Amino acid sequence: MNGGILLSAPLYQMIYTDLKKQIEKGNYEINDLLPTEKELAALYSVSTITAKKALDLLKEEGYILRKPRKGSVIISNRKNESTF
């Protein structure tokens, strides 16, 4: 027993890490759209709030630009290397 401490990361962190790896591997190109919050929620079986948190982290790290009613656009395939 680990004293009740959870060792796994939050779901939004796991989704963020998965998407980041996909971006860095080239599965998504610059200017590609990521799936919507709703699509990510369905894909990962989480709430849209959890999907939003993952996308917010990608934005904070400089991987995506979030455009209202348009989606999340890839702007960099490496941390802090945006094309803007």
What are these regions (language model features)?
Residues A54-D56:
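Short, hydrophobic-biased segments on the C-terminal half of alpha helices
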Residues M1-I49, Y63-L65, R78-T83:
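Extreme N-terminal segment that seeds HTH/winged-HTH DNA-binding domains in transcriptional regulators
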